[in-house]
């Protein structure tokens, strides 16, 4: 099922998808993801070896979204305090800096729906 931006707008930082079945990858993309699914320690080193507190990357294995929407991941250093990466104003500020004047939807999956749970991260969807 291809998810439209309008569908994605049902979710936000206060209301992430309750189930991983509400938004998912294509079967092919999911299989590629499972083959790649990184060692979380290696991923941490890859993302944060430069000492940054956060980084934004285009999703390597995006959800099944329409072509006019891009899927990014906002990764936070796992060494940050819980309070900071859960500060909604801080998250909004980061999103506004990087995607100024763009139509965005963003959320962090519930813990039970995270496949990478040792590195705090938000899904960001940007409509072109």
Residue spans for each PLM region:
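HIT superfamily nucleotide-processing domains
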Residues: 1-128
